[in-house]
UniProtKB/Swiss-Prot annotation:
Swiss-Prot/TrEMBL site (Important for substrate specificity) positions: 13, 77, 162
Cofactor: a divalent metal cation
Active site: 76
Family the entry assigns: Belongs to the Maf family. YceF subfamily.
Top-level division of the source organism's lineage: Bacteria
Major location (coarse): cytoplasm
Purpose of the protein: Nucleoside triphosphate pyrophosphatase that hydrolyzes 7-methyl-GTP (m(7)GTP). May have a dual role in cell division arrest and in preventing the incorporation of modified nucleotides into cellular nucleic acids.
CDD domains: Maf (cd00555)
Enzyme Commission number(s) of this protein: 3.6.1.-
Protein's UniProt name: 7-methyl-GTP pyrophosphatase
Localization in the cell: Cytoplasm
Length: 199
């Protein structure tokens, strides 16, 4: 019997990616405090990609504890600019600060995914993308945030590449799915290997 697939996420974008791929799954948000997990890692000097892996694993493990006979997919994404790690902005002023810091420079997205079953990590994967934002004026940032509003608070970096955020960039290197926070091609390959989807 094929195990039930569960996405350990409340993200509508991650759900959309899995739905668009034709996967049959349930989505259940992980009951973890992400900041409580990542703060000690960051304080210890963990790299942003390592933090993403730990969070992806933690989300999948928590949901797996509630649905032990399922294959649980956890994912997370961190964003870094040099040694600085960015988190989702807390308000529109914070979003403006993020966009000002990213203006005219290249930053990195680190997207991690893990599969857990019965509390055991079966697989994990990390992918990276490099994004270069075009130079933005303070006035343009204000107009952009006025248009997108609270949506800017739902992603690290205060942009949503799948929407108006694409207008902020001049160069992107990396897989589209990695940028959206769920590396679909390696995930689908692993799900086929595990017999969870037809292949």
């Amino acid at each position: 019997m094929t195990p039930k697939l569960i996405l350990a996420s409340s993200s509508p974008f991650r759900r959309m990616l899995m739905e668009n791929a034709g996967l049959s799954f349930e989505a259940h948000a992980a009951r973890i405090d992400e900041r409580a997990v990542e703060a000690p890692l960051e304080n210890a000097g963990a790299k942003p990609d390592a933090v993403a892996l730990v969070l992806a694993r933690a989300k999948a493990e928590e949901v797996s504890s509630r649905f032990p006979d399922s294959l649980v997919i956890g994912s997370d994404q961190t964003m870094s600019l040099g040694d600085s790690v960015f988190h989702k902005p807390t308000d529109l002023a914070d979003a403006a600060s993020h966009l000002q810091a990213l203006s005219g420079v290249t930053h990195r997205l680190n997207s991690a995914v893990a599969i857990v079953s019965d509390g055991v990590v079966l697989w994990e994967h990390l992918a990276h993308a490099q994004l270069t934002m075009r130079p933005l004026t303070v006035e343009f940032i204000a107009r952009h945030l006025a248009r997108v509003g609270e949506r800017a608070l739902s992603s690290v970096g205060a942009y949503q590449l799948e929407g108006e955020g694409i207008q902020l960039f001049e160069k992107i290197e990396g897989d589209y799915f990695t940028i959206l926070g769920l590396p679909m091609l390696p995930l689908l390959k692993k799900l086929r290997e595990l017999g969870a989807i037809d292949g």
